[in-house]
C-alpha cells in the first residue's frame, strides 16, 4: 500500500469505494490555493453527477410531486449547506490539500470549499471507474436523506413556509438583514439575521449567497416559532 493509499484509507471506507487510482481522489481534494492541478474541473463534472442522481432518486421516491416541487426538493438537497454537512460527516476537511493562506483562515472547515471538494470527489469516482460507480456513491450518501423527506415541509422553501405560517396567524412578515459579508468575489460568505418582531424571535443563517443564508435563517426561525407556539399552547 502506497503512502497516498494509506492517507485516504478511512475516507475510501466512508465512501464505500476503493480507488484504483488514488491520485484522482487527491486531485479532487486539492484546492486551487495549493496547486494548479486542482479540483475545479472535477467539481464541474461532479455537480452534474450529483444533480442527475438526486433528481432521479426524487423522481422515483415521489411520483405524486410536480416538476416544480421536485426541483425545490433537489435544490435543498444539493445546496452548499447540505453538501458541507455531508462532507463534515465524512471528515472530508481532514483530507484537503490547501494553500498556506487557506489553512490559516480555516479553509478546511469552510462550507464552500467542503462542498466543492465533495462534488469533485464524485467526479473522481467516475473517472476512476464509471458514472454508475459515482452514482452509487451519491445514492449511499443520500438514501437516508431522501427517505426521510417530509414533503409537506420541504416542497416549499423555508422563506415561503415561514411567510405562510406568519400570515396564517396574522403576524407581521419577517425582516432579513445582512450581519456580515466576507470572502473574495467568487467565494463570498454571508451571515443573515431573520427578525420576527411581533414574536420577539431572532435567528441567524450562513451561506455562500445571500439567498442561501436567508433560507437557513428562515428554517431556524420556523423551528423557534414552532417551539414558542407549542410552549404557549401548553401554558393555556
Curated annotation (Swiss-Prot):
Residues 8-130 form the RNase III domain. CDD domains: DSRM_RNAse_III_family (cd10845), RIBOc (cd00593). Its cofactor is Mg(2+). One of its GO terms (molecular function) is double-stranded RNA binding. GO terms for biological process: mRNA processing; regulation of gene expression; rRNA processing; tRNA processing. The active site is at residues 47, 119. InterPro entries: dsRBD_dom, RNase_III, RNase_III_dom, RNase_III_sf. Digests double-stranded RNA. Involved in the processing of primary rRNA transcript to yield the immediate precursors to the large and small rRNAs (23S and 16S). Processes some mRNAs, and tRNAs when they are encoded in the rRNA operon. Processes pre-crRNA and tracrRNA of type II CRISPR loci if present in the organism. This is Ribonuclease 3. The gene is rnc.
Amino acid at each position: 500500500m502506497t503512502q497516498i493509499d494509506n492517507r485516504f484509507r478511512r475516507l475510501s471506507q466512508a465512501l464505500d469505494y476503493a480507488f484504483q487510482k488514488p491520485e484522482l481522489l487527491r486531485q479532487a481534494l486539492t484546492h486551487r490555493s495549493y496547486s494548479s492541478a486542482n479540483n475545479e474541473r472535477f467539481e464541474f463534472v461532479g455537480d452534474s453527477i450529483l444533480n442527475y442522481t438526486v433528481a432521479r432518486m426524487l423522481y422515483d421516491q415521489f411520483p405524486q410531486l410536480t416538476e416544480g416541487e421536485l426541483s425545490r426538493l433537489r435544490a435543498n438537497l444539493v445546496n452548499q449547506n447540505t453538501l458541507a454537512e455531508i462532507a463534515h460527516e465524512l471528515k472530508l476537511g481532514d483530507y484537503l490539500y490547501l494553500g498556506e493562506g487557506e489553512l490559516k483562515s480555516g479553509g478546511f472547515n469552510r462550507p464552500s470549499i467542503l462542498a466543492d471538494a465533495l462534488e469533485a470527489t464524485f467526479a473522481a469516482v467516475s473517472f476512476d471507474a464509471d458514472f454508475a460507480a459515482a452514482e452509487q456513491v451519491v445514492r449511499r450518501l443520500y438514501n437516508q436523506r431522501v427517505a426521510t423527506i417530509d414533503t409537506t415541509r420541504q416542497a416549499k422553501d423555508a422563506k415561503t413556509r415561514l411567510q405562510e405560517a406568519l400570515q396564517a396567524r396574522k403576524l407581521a412578515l419577517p425582516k432579513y438583514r445582512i450581519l456580515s459579508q466576507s470572502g473574495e468575489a467568487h467565494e463570498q460568505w454571508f451571515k443573515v439575521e431573520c427578525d420576527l418582531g411581533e414574536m420577539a424571535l431572532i435567528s441567524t443563517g450562513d451561506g455562500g449567497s445571500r439567498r442561501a443564508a436567508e433560507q437557513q435563517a428562515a428554517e431556524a426561525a420556523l423551528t423557534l416559532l414552532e417551539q414558542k407556539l407549542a410552549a404557549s399552547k401548553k401554558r393555556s
